[in-house]
Amino acid sequence: MYFTKVHGLGNDFILVNAGTGQGFTDDCSTLAKEVCDRKFGIGADGLVLLYDSGVADVRMKIVNSDGSEAEMCGNAIRCVAKYLYDHGIIKKDEIKVETLAGIIVPQIIQQEGSVKAVRVDMGEPRVERAEIPMIGPPGQVIGEELAVNGKVYLVTAVSMGNPHCIIFVPDLEDISLTQVGPQIEVHPAFPKKTNVEFVQVLGPNEVRMVVWERGAGPTMACGTGACAVAVAGVLNGFTERMVTVHLPGGSLMIEWAENGRIYMTGPATEVFSGEYTVYNPSRR
């Protein structure tokens, strides 16, 4: 199996161009667990598979390191756009990518023939409780109390095609992400589980965040999470519609435009390529 290792701000993926998918494994969950293992596999936060699409330029499938499938990933889609453009597979400034969250359109920002950054139209956020989804009465979830193991957090829920639970705090240093993150991820209020973001507001156009990703745990960056944080900042009156989001792996520029759509701009990096031997023949 030929692969390319890529990352967006340290959120890393194993990218495989599966084409028609003919002859490729149906057991992507087991494959992802194997190749994403950082001690016995290649090591990554997730496996990204590219297939031919009948409705877009390409179809992207994302499988987390725990084998669960994700609807969408902002860092992964920037990496996909860079890979397709730099390798001459799709030489267009705008690439239509089919995902479980709908068709997403990354825009190439190039310099001297290669991709410098990628601006992605992430679509419109969903803020109604049922769209997250989150258990409870109809309406938006903005600064709502959520009890977690005897402690109460004020949460804001946003969907970017995948669920996000955002919590604003005075200081990120006071948060034990590895303890609280997994507790909220599987909280019964979220029937499909949730990504969890803790956010410190630095100013009306600047925030810091850390993320516990559903199915992956703590990661260096989360593109959809940064978009959800930008929306939550506006809904709570903490930030303006253009905000720089600082993550452990670097920064993303997020704009919630007046047309209601979210635009994310950030880098993508190709690390290396190789061939991986999948030892179980049923997974080849």
Swiss-Prot record:
Keywords: Amino-acid biosynthesis, Cytoplasm, Isomerase, Lysine biosynthesis. HAMAP family: DAP_epimerase. This is Diaminopimelate epimerase. NCBIfam families: DapF. Its EC number is 5.1.1.7. Belongs to the diaminopimelate epimerase family. GO terms for biological process: lysine biosynthetic process via diaminopimelate. Its main location: cytoplasm. Substrate binds at N11, N64, G74, N75, N162, N195, E213, R214, G223, T224. It catalyses: (2S,6S)-2,6-diaminopimelate = meso-2,6-diaminopimelate. It is an enzyme of class 5 (isomerase). Catalyzes the stereoinversion of LL-2,6-diaminopimelate (L,L-DAP) to meso-diaminopimelate (meso-DAP), a precursor of L-lysine and an essential component of the bacterial peptidoglycan. It is found in: Cytoplasm. The active site is at C73, C222. Signal peptide: none annotated. GO terms for cellular component: cytosol.
